Curated annotation (Swiss-Prot):
It comes from Rattus norvegicus (Rat). Belongs to the intercrine beta (chemokine CC) family. This is C-C motif chemokine 4. Residues 1-23 form the signal peptide. Homodimer. GO terms for molecular function: CCR chemokine receptor binding; CCR1 chemokine receptor binding; CCR5 chemokine receptor binding; chemokine activity; identical protein binding. InterPro entries: Chemokine_b/g/d (IPR039809), Chemokine_CC_CS (IPR000827), Chemokine_IL8-like_dom (IPR001811), Interleukin_8-like_sf (IPR036048). It is found in: Secreted. GO terms for cellular component: extracellular space.
Length: 92
């Protein structure tokens, strides 16, 4: 009897875990990073190594610049200098 109760408990635990994993639609990963504010200053172009755009699931769009020191800096994609840096990084 104890074995049946233990097995049933384990089955319920596994079912609860699988339900939460399978309940999300396929491909609906939560965004890995979102920006809630932008840098107030222009970054020196020499410090910027790469960039990425935040997910469309974020509350506001942003371009995240990756610096030589490994920092991630959020920038406003409507700023002219941000577009200039993105274009420059795409060409190189």
């Amino acid at each position: 009897m104890k074995l049946c109760v233990s097995a049933f408990s384990l089955l319920l635990l596994v079912a609860a875990f699988c339900d939460s994993v399978l309940s999300a639609p396929i491909g609906s990963d939560p965004p890995t990073s979102c920006c809630f504010s932008y840098t107030s200053r222009k970054i020196h172009r020499n410090f910027v190594m790469d960039y990425y755009e935040t997910s469309s699931l974020c509350s506001q769009p942003a371009v995240v610049f990756l610096t030589k020191k490994g920092r991630q800096i959020c920038a406003d994609p409507s700023e002219p200098w941000v577009n200039e840096y993105v274009n420059d990084l795409e060409l190189n």
